[in-house]
């Protein structure tokens, strides 16, 4: 056997060290200031997540716990803001106090398990947990939090779409990573009253895509009676508004008495009440210090943190994954495939976008209407099969009839090769998607002449392209909205600067006028003092002459 055909020595070693283990994704959601960051650090028993306005100032990629290894540092995976800047990465600036932060979603990838470099015995590779922690920032800090629920729901739905597109491919990626969220912890503000409107809306929206566990934070701020009543209020609101949270239900057909007792105990603790802290004592435990003493956050008498850790990483980890896969994802998958398979042939009018990316040329129309009315946009949006009288209702008829074709020709001539290539690629993609959806229509798929293998191939090609096309359109629409909001904000700043400049000019004019008035008044006072001095001298002279005459 020749040397060239001999396999490398480390070939099997690489196969053995291939990534194995459990993939587990958790979402921490809730209003700002409820302790999500502190909980994440306490959950992993390390300080790798910085608090607000501390981003970039701490070593977020360094873990003090040998059992926790940061694979990918924290990154922004999605955000939506009226100001166009993610609040998570922005520094503290009092000048931005009047701006709404929007919502930012971050992701951190970690590896939980034994560290072989620490001299510990090698553990089973299947026990390693590849943990993805998703966190939300900015909820509850906006005048309108509807964009927060929409952004979180859109992110969760996108993860389902990615898995669905991968499953329907003929050739799958062997290194595909599942990013679906298996459990979401929703942090409730410790008001003592119950759920708020934003809590109900958010938990309802995300419960379609993941298991939701409500969490009460700062449990040490309640007495035992107050905490019991707060739990009852929350569960009453959950039943009243039909919020589908994850419940530890007891199966009457289950023969495992230990499991039944465990679920009963966990159901009585819902929602879990926890305490978090950034302070460690001399033994390395997380504690909270008070004037009257020190308490441990893992104390079962005052906090459910220890029980919650066991639920998340022990007893119910696989159940969360199974529920996400077999119930939530399957419902979404069947609904999505039905909508794609039953889609009729899409005409050219529905695939064309009605707006282009904003630019400085249409800045004025963007500020006033939020739409783009430039000649280039009109030429791009105009279709060959669109009658002229349909367009004349929105635009000036005489200008369009006289100059429409000329402007379109000029734009085609002046358009750069890059833009022309981009338009051609976009047109090809739209034609491809249109043809795929046509082939996936019921009339085409139910044809008796079509082989079964061809039907499966058409379905496998349809879903990924359709899902990707929908995501691209959603991203483009989002970018256009952000650009429009930024343009409006820029216009407001321009008007504010112009107003301040006008005020400065008026102030300068007033100061100059006061100076002139001051100089003229000083001259008048000097003249008056001179005249009075002359009168005084005259008086003295008259008195002297009178006195001399008497003598």
Curated annotation (Swiss-Prot):
MF (Gene Ontology): GTP binding; GTPase activity; molecular adaptor activity; structural constituent of cytoskeleton
Q: Where in the cell is it found?
A: Membrane; Bud neck
Task: Tell me the residues on which Phosphoserine occurs.
Answer: 408, 416, 447, 460, 519-520, 522, 525, 545, 548
Record keyword Hydrolase present: no
Protein keywords: Acetylation, Cell cycle, Cell division, Coiled coil, GTP-binding, Isopeptide bond, Membrane, Nucleotide-binding, Phosphoprotein, Ubl conjugation
Q: Which residues carry this modification: Phosphotyrosine?
A: 400
Boundaries of each Septin-type G domain copy?
Answer: 20-339
Q: Which residues are recorded as binding GTP? A: 30-37, 138, 218-226, 288
Q: Which family does it belong to?
A: Belongs to the TRAFAC class TrmE-Era-EngA-EngB-Septin-like GTPase superfamily. Septin GTPase family.
The further comment given in this record reads: Present with 5620 molecules/cell in log phase SD medium.
What is the annotated role of this protein in its UniProt record? Answer: Septins are GTPases involved in cytokinesis that assemble early in the cell cycle as a patch at the incipient bud site and form a ring approximately 15 minutes before bud emergence, which transforms into an hour-glass shaped collar of cortical filaments that spans both sides of the mother-bud neck. This collar persists until just before cytokinesis, when it splits into two rings that occupy opposite sides of the neck. The septins at the bud neck serve as a structural scaffold that recruits different components involved in diverse processes at specific stages during the cell cycle.
This one is known as Seventh homolog of septin 1
Organism of derivation: Saccharomyces cerevisiae (strain ATCC 204508 / S288c) (Baker's yeast)
């Amino acid at each position: 056997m020749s040397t060239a055909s001999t396999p490398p020595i480390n070939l099997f070693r690489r196969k053995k060290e291939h990534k194995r283990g459990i993939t587990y994704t958790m979402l921490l959601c809730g209003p700002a200031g409820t302790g999500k960051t502190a909980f994440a650090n306490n959950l992993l028993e390390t300080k790798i997540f910085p608090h607000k306005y501390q981003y970039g100032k701490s070593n977020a990629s360094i873990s003090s716990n040998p059992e926790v290894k940061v694979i990918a540092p924290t990154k922004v995976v999605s955000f939506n803001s009226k100001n166009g800047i993610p609040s998570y990465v922005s520094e503290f600036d009092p000048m931005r106090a009047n701006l709404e932060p929007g919502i930012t979603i971050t992701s951190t990838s970690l590896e939980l398990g034994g560290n072989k470099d620490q001299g510990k015995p090698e553990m089973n590779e299947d026990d390693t947990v590849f943990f993805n922690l998703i966190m939300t920032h900015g909820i509850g800090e906006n005048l309108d939090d509807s964009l927060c629920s929409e952004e979180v729901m859109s992110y969760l739905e996108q993860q389902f779409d990615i898995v669905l597109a991968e499953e329907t491919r003929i050739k799958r990626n062997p290194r595909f990573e599942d990013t679906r969220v298996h459990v979401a912890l929703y942090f409730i503000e410790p008001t003592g009253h119950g759920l708020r409107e934003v809590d109900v809306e958010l938990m309802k929206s995300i419960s379609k895509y993941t298991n939701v566990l409500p969490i009460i934070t700062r449990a040490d701020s309640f007495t035992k009676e107050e905490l019991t009543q707060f739990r009852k209020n929350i569960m009453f609101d959950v039943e009243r508004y039909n919020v589908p949270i994850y419940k530890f239900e007891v199966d009457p057909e289950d023969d495992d008495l230990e499991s039944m007792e465990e679920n009963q105990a966990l159901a009585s603790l819902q929602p879990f009440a926890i305490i978090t802290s950034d302070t460690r004592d001399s033994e390395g435990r997380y504690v909270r210090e008070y004037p009257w003493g020190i308490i441990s956050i893992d104390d079962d008498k005052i906090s459910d943190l220890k029980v919650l850790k066991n639920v998340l990483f022990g007893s119910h980890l696989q159940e969360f994954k199974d529920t996400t896969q077999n119930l939530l994802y399957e419902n979404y998958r069947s609904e999505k495939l039905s909508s794609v398979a039953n889609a009729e042939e899409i005409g050219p009018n529905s695939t064309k976008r009605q707006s282009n990316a904003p630019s400085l040329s249409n800045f004025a129309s963007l500020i006033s209407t939020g739409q783009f009315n430039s000649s280039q946009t009109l030429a791009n949006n105009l279709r060959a099969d669109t009658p002229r009288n349909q367009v004349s209702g929105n635009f000036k008829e005489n200008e369009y009839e006289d100059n429409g074709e000329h402007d379109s020709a000029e734009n085609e001539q002046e358009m750069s090769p890059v833009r022309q290539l981009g338009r051609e690629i976009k047109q090809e993609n739209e034609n491809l998607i249109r043809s795929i959806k046509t082939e996936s229509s019921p009339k085409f798929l139910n044809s008796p002449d079509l082989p079964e293998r061809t039907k499966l191939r058409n379905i496998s090609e349809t879903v990924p392209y359709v899902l990707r096309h929908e995501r691209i359109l959603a991203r483009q629409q989002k970018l256009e909205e952000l650009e429009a909001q930024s343009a409006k904000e820029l216009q407001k700043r321009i008007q504010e600067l112009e107003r301040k400049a006008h005020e400065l000019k008026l102030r300068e004019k007033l100061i100059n006028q006061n100076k002139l008035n001051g100089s003229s008044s000083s001259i008048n006072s000097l003249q008056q003092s001179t005249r009075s001095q002359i009168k005084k001298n005259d008086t003295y002279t008259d008195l002297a002459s009178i006195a001399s005459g008497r003598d």
